[in-house]
């Protein structure tokens, strides 16, 4: 895990060489640490057993790693009532999925956009990233 100069940038991914100059001093690796990662499809049954929920909502903020989290959900993604994800518009992390790829991935699994909103007003007028909320068409009534 990459610990960045500014902790809000810490990520499994390394900083993008194409990141905007305004991030360069804050989004640089100062230390790496080992950590355990688990796939959501193996973790979700444990969480359901522990907390007893029936309609999970997946909220992610994994600093460029959201698509990998969704892929790690396997078939369990279809049990999610909805998903909230960060959608990268400008590159911050190497290998981070852009907003179009993330939207396409979710729509291919029958998740419909419900809302998009900028998650950081400090970079107006150029959008860096936004949050997107998607609902599972199979589980939500029109």
Predicted features and spans:
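Conserved acidic-Pro-Pro-aromatic motif
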Residues: 43-142
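Glycine-rich adenosyl-binding loop in Rossmann-like folds that engage adenosine-containing cofactors
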Residues: 1-38
């Amino acid at each position: 895990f990459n610990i960045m100069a500014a902790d809000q940038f810490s990520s499994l991914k390394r900083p993008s060489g194409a990141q905007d100059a305004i991030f360069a001093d804050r989004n640089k690796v100062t230390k790496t640490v080992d950590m355990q990662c688990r796939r959501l499809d193996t973790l979700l049954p444990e969480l359901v057993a522990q907390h007893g929920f029936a309609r999970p909502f997946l909220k992610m903020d994994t600093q460029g790693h959201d698509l990998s989290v969704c892929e790690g959900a396997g078939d369990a993604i279809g049990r999610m009532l909805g998903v909230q994800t960060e959608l990268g518009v400008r590159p911050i992390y190497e290998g981070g999925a852009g907003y179009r790829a993330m939207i396409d991935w979710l729509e291919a699994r029958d998740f419909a956009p419900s809302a998009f909103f900028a998650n950081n007003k400090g970079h107006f007028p150029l959008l860096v990233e936004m949050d997107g909320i998607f609902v599972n068409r199979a589980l939500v009534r029109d």
